[in-house]
Amino acid sequence: HIRNDGIVTIVLPHGVLFRGGEEGTIRKNLIDHNNIDAIIGLPANIFFGTGIPTIIMVLRKNKKDSDVLIIDASKGFEKDGKNNKLRACDIKRIVDAYKERPEKIEKFARRVSRAEIIQNDYNLNIPRYVDSSEKAESWDIYASMFGGIPEAELQDLSAYWTAFPHLKAALFSPDNEAYCRLNVANLKNAVLSHPDVVAFKTAFQNAFGDFDAYLKSVLIDGMTQLNAAGEEERLSREIFARLAGIPLVDRYAAYQLLDDDWKKIAIDLEIIQTEGFAATKQVDPNMVLKKDAEVQDGWVGHVLPFELVQNVKMHEEVAALRAKETRLSEIAGEYESHLDELSEEDKEQNFVNDAKDAFVAAEVKKAIKAREVEPATMSILKDVDALFAEEKTLKKQVKDDSAALHQRTKGVIEHLTDEEVRDLLHRKWILPLMENLNSLPDAVLDDFVKQLDSVCKKYETTFEDVESQIASTEHELMGLLDDLQGNEFDMKGIAELKKLLGGE
C-alpha cells in the first residue's frame, strides 16, 4: 500500500516493456490507469550475476498528467571490471531529466503521450520512442570519385558552426552547392586561432574567472560551518549557471569533475567538522600488514598528504632527492649502453651474467685486476666499476634522504600555522578542480578538430588516385619482371604474371 501521492520504483528486465501474455495485460492496466510515470533504460551488465538489460519503472498512484517520460540511459556508463557502472554524471543526467520532464532531449529522453502508447498497442519498448543509436558512417559516391568534402557531412558538425558562425567560411571554399574544399594548410592552427574560437575560450575563462575565489570563500572560509551533505548540489548549480551561456561544453562532464574532487573534499570536511581544525595538523601511524601482523611503516597525514606538503613546503629537499633518483635511472641506462659496446666474445666472460643483460660487479673488479682483456674492454669495465660505486653511494643516500624527508614532513605538518593549512587545503581541494574545469574547452576543441580532420581526410584520395597508383605500381613491377632471369618454368611463370598485370 502506498499513499495517494506515493511513488514506487521497480527494477525489471527490459523485456517486460514489450512481451505479451500476463506482462502485456499488466502493462495495459498500468497505462489505462495512468500509473506509469517514467521508464528509465539502464546499461546492460550493470548488476552482478546477470548481463541482461534492465529498466527502472517509476509508478505514481495519482498522476497529474497522462504522459510517460521515457529515458534511454543505456549509453552512459564506465567499465568496472567485467561490469558496467553508472557514473555520478550519468545518475545526475537521469535525475535532472526526471525532475524537469522535458518534451525531448535528443538521443536521451522523450515525453510520450498515452495516446501514442495505445496506438502502439501498449508496447513500451524504449527504441520505439527514443533513438539513442549513433549515426552509421556513410561514404559519398561523388566525393569518392572526384574528391571534395560533402556539405552534408559538414552539417553533422552543425553545433560547432552555430557556436563559431564565421569559422566554416574561413576554412572551406565551395566547389559547388553540395561540395567544398579545405583552403588552409594547417587545420588545427586555423581552428584554434580563429576569432570565434578565441572568443569561445575567453567566454569560458570569464565565466569561471572568479570561481576559484568563490570556492575558497565557500569551502575554505566556511569549512567548519557548511552543510557538506548538500554542498555538492549547491556547487553543481553554480557550475551549471556559469555554463549556461557557454555552448558545446557538456555541463555533466563538468559535474563529473566536481564529483570526482568532492569525494576527497567531503571526507576532509567531515574530519574537520567532527574532530576540529586541529585534525588538519595531525599525522597517523601508517599501519601495514607484514607476515600476518599489522606493523607501523612510517606516518600518513590525517588530512594533508605528505606528498603535497613536501612539494609545497620542502621543494628544495624534494628536488635534491629527485635528482639523485634521476641519476640512478641514468646509471641503469649507461649499464645497457656499455653492454652494447662489448663484443659477443666479451659477453661470454664471467663479468657478464648468464642472461647477457647485466654486469656482475665482483667479476668486473676481478677482470680489471687481472688485466687480461683488450684495452677497449678494459676502459668499458673501469667505467662500469665506477658506475657500480656511484650507484651504491646514491642508493644509500636516497634511502637516508627519503627517511629524513619523511620524518621532517611529519614535523612540518604538526607545526603548520592555520594560514599554511588553509593554503594547503586550497591546493588539495580547489586547484585540481579548477585545472580540470579549465581544460574542458580544450577537450571540446580537440574533439572538434579530430572530427573535422577525419571528414577532410576521408576523400583526400579518390578512386581515380587509387587506380593511378595501382597502374603505376604495376608498371614498375613490369619493369622489374623484365630484368628477371631463370629456367624455362620460371620464365613461363613470369610471363603469366605479366599477362595478369596487363603487360601482354
What are these model-derived regions, one by one?
Residues H1-W299, A320, R327, E336, ...:
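A conserved structural/catalytic subdomain of Rossmann-like adenosyl-cofactor enzymes
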Residues P305, K313-H315:
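Secretory/endomembrane lumenal or extracellular ectodomains immediately following the signal peptide
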Residues G301-V303:
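Extended alpha-helical interaction scaffolds
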